[in-house]
């Protein structure tokens, strides 16, 4: 069973699903749903349509250059069935999938880190600009007055003695 990719949005197209458009030069376009087919007929660019995989990769929102993505390449060479090879392949697929998930999570966190730093810098600058709203102008004077009173009392006690 071969799972194809949608030409427009890169979603998986399972056998018996979706539509196929074959151009005069025998180029085959597969679509997962009518939404993708309609956008293709309207000559929309998948890299400019915000909900497609192509947009997410071109905008730097998804991992594009990674060794774990090499395993998904299409291979047209038939291989004779071998139970041992099959079990090793399935195990390798599980490992690759777990590695890919970890790398994607790390990529997303690194991408979000920049925004958090910018947000923190903006918050700090806003606090610096509006510090008068946070700290009242006479906030420290009560403590100073109290210290002065203690000093005066200490001086008065010394003078009396």
UniProtKB/Swiss-Prot annotation:
BP GO terms, sorted: ribosomal large subunit biogenesis
Main location: nucleus
SMART domains for the chain: TRASH (SM00746)
Location of this chain's protein in the cell: Nucleus, Nucleolus
CDD domains hit by this protein: Ribosomal_L24e_L24
Listed transmembrane segments: none
InterPro entries tied to this protein: L24e/L24_sf, Ribosomal_eL24, Ribosomal_eL24-rel_N, Ribosomal_eL24_CS, TRASH_dom
Subunit comment: Associated with nucleolar and cytoplasmic pre-60S particles. At the end of biogenesis it dissociates from cytoplasmic pre-60S particles and is likely to be exchanged for its ribosomal homolog, RPL24.
Family note: Belongs to the eukaryotic ribosomal protein eL24 family.
Protein name: Probable ribosome biogenesis protein RLP24
Organism whose genome encodes this protein: Danio rerio (Zebrafish)
Highest classification ranks of the organism: Eukaryota, Metazoa, Chordata, Craniata, Vertebrata
